Amino acid sequence: ASCLVGSEMCIRDRGRAIPFVDEGDGPVKLVLIQEQGLAADVLGVAAHYLAEEAGFHVLRIGHRSESEATLDERVEDAIAVIDHVGIEDTWVGGHGFGGTIARALVSAHSDRANGLLLLGVEDVDIAVAPAIPVLIVQGTEDTDTPAANAEALQATIPDRSSIKTIAGDHLFPMHHPIETGVIIEEYLDWD
């Protein structure tokens, strides 16, 4: 069932409300999972750019209100929204902890993903699914998800991962949304 949280749509699934924003209808599809615990919509402008200017179909997924959910439950939340919207053949990505959820989702459901997009990389031990390309966008001054994490991940899959940098801290997607969007657009829409 659909519901409304502020100005965002949400779905109610097994008693939890999961907010999301669905924009655009282009052939290139991208699921973006928000960082946790930020009041601001850090990915909003970059996602809007991708939907309006690049012609992508972008699904942004937030977090249920209770913060005690496990990583697996958060993956289930994202899958529930993806299924509700009906997106297939998509890149899956996220910012900070949202990227960790995306990594876990793609690791467990690699058949549902065309690629993995990480806006900052948390230091977690989650294997990247075989044959999945990975784009990492890294803030040069990011101390929450430092460049060393991105470099360590890339070292495990050098043949199918790329790191692009943006001047800025952990909130680079909000402070430099168009630059973030252009990097994503050029990588995902190269063909």
Indicate where each model-derived feature is located.
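Gly/Ala-rich beta-loop-alpha elbow adjacent to hydrolase catalytic centers
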Residues: 94-98, 102
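Conserved acidic catalytic loop of the alpha/beta-hydrolase fold
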Residues: 75-90
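Short alpha-helix in the alpha/beta-hydrolase fold that links the catalytic acid
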Residues: 146-154
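Conserved HGGG/HGGXW glycine-rich cap/lid loop of the alpha/beta-hydrolase fold
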Residues: 19-66
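Single conserved hydrophobic/aromatic residue that forms the stacking wall/gate
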Residues: 1-11
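Catalytic histidine-centered segment of alpha/beta-hydrolase-like enzymes
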Residues: 168-177
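A conserved short beta-strand
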Residues: 111-123
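Short beta-strand/loop motif that positions the catalytic acidic residue
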Residues: 130, 136-138, 142
